[in-house]
Swiss-Prot record:
GO terms for molecular function: deacetoxycephalosporin-C hydroxylase activity; L-ascorbic acid binding. It catalyses: deacetoxycephalosporin C + 2-oxoglutarate + O2 = deacetylcephalosporin C + succinate + CO2. The lineage of its organism: Bacteria, Bacillati, Actinomycetota, Actinomycetes, Pseudonocardiales. Keywords: Antibiotic biosynthesis, Iron, Oxidoreductase, Vitamin C. The keyword Oxidoreductase applies. Signal peptide: none annotated. This is Deacetoxycephalosporin C hydroxylase. It is an enzyme of class 1 (oxidoreductase). It comes from Amycolatopsis lactamdurans (Nocardia lactamdurans).
Length: 310
């Protein structure tokens, strides 16, 4: 693992171009931290607490009522170990050691009106911030050749709160090195706001210059990771870094729980791309066609993710 440090930019710096050369360098690596983007620590805490209360207090019946029956959509509650990123990426069959709640623009499954109000406001603030950030990232590289940016950024985003419980002994690093498999996101960009593990363990890592780099919690900041759409619209200049969530070893299980609030700025489902170009840029697209839509791609992944083997 590398000891490289990923820089922190403020939205004000990105807007005024005061660190433009450095920002362009890190946009071309596909990962950086961002502060001053609109949402506050209180916004994150209220939304996280709302979901965590439901995880802890919701009955089995209440959780079942907000568990989607549509395998191609991320909506509502997903139980602990109900998904496997490893299956999607063909890196194993182990499950994601987390539970989650997800929402989007429509088709949502809210546990209560209060939950809906808190999460809708949170979603809207992150959507605005992610749109502005994506515009700055995609134009920084100087190679943008996608459709009109306003059209691309009229998106079908997903907001997901993941809770990674304290790691049990059988999922310690000695037995299973990861809580979540290496993957890149199917998004334009992704915001990740994380809470730190109480014991100081850093779980999130991303690939930078061919090495995995730790991404610890930074106060008032989100991690920005560029997703698979970025290389498709920048002639490969902006990558989609692989990232994963690693497991602590047996000596650091206590206090290893954490949360991760993830906003995927996904294009509309009718966004069309060249499958050969995607493969040229290192993306694993198994669809047997020359041109595909984002809806074709994402739907296949979600079905595979939920086909958890026992």
């Amino acid at each position: 693992m590398s000891d490289k440090t990923v820089p922190v930019f403020s939205m004000a710096e990105l807007r005024d171009g005061s660190r433009q050369d450095e920002f362009r360098e890190w946009a071309r690596r596909g990962v950086f931290y961002l502060t001053g983007y609109g949402a506050t620590e209180r916004d994150h805490r209220v939304a996280t607490d709302t979901a965590m209360d439901f995880f802890a207090q919701g009955t089995a019946e209440e959780k079942q009522a907000v568990t989607t029956k549509v395998p191609t959509m991320r909506r509502g509650y997903s139980a602990l170990e109900a998904e496997s990123t490893a299956q999607v990426t063909n890196t194993g069959t182990y499950t994601d050691y987390s539970m989650s709640y997800s929402m989007g623009i429509g088709g949502n499954l809210f546990p209560s009106k209060e939950f809906e109000s808190v999460w809708t406001d949170y979603f809207d603030s992150l959507y605005r911030a992610a749109q502005e950030t994506a515009r700055l990232v995609l134009t920084a590289a100087g190679t943008y050749d996608g459709e009109d940016l306003d059209t691309l950024l009229d998106c079908d985003p997903v907001l997901r709160l993941r809770y990674f419980p304290e790691v049990p002994e059988h999922r310690a690093a000695e037995y299973e090195p990861r809580r979540m498999a290496p993957h890149y996101d199917l998004s334009i960009i992704t915001f990740i706001h994380q809470t730190p593990c109480a014991n100081g363990f850093v779980s999130l890592q991303a690939e930078v210059d061919g090495e995995m780099v730790s991404l610890p919690h930074v106060e008032d900041a989100v991690v920005v990771l560029c997703g698979a759409i970025a290389p498709l619209v920048t002639q490969g200049a902006v990558p989609a870094p692989n990232h994963h969530v690693v497991s602590p070893d047996a000596s650091m299980l206590k206090g290893s729980d954490r949360t991760s609030s993830v906003f995927f700025l996904r294009p509309s489902t009718d966004f069309t791309f060249s499958v050969p170009d995607a493969r040229k840029y290192g993306l694993d697209v198994s669809l047997d066609m020359e041109k595909a839509t984002f809806g074709d791609w994402i739907g296949t992944n979600y079905v595979t993710m939920h086909a958890v083997t026992s």
